């Protein structure tokens, strides 16, 4: 399973997102649920609530393979 997270505060770059389980990033601006985001990242695991809060991410849910 893969999980998507959006980055509303800064682009997805080293130090701005968790490293563990990171599969892919995209730095295209997007607007999930009408919220401006600098990009997205996909993980092979669900991030903890603490990680989501610490890195100020938005949970985008499970990604269909």
Give residue spans per PLM region.
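Short structural boundary motif marking the start of a folded domain
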Residues: 1-3
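Acidic, low-complexity, intrinsically disordered interaction modules
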Residues: 7-65
């Amino acid at each position: 399973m893969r999980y998507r997270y959006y980055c509303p505060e800064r682009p997805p770059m080293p130090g701005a997102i968790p490293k563990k389980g990171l599969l892919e990033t995209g730095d295209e601006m997007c607007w999930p649920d009408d919220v401006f985001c600098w990009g997205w990242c996909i993980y092979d695991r669900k991030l903890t609530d603490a990680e989501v809060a610490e890195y100020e991410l938005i949970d985008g849910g499970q990604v269909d393979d």
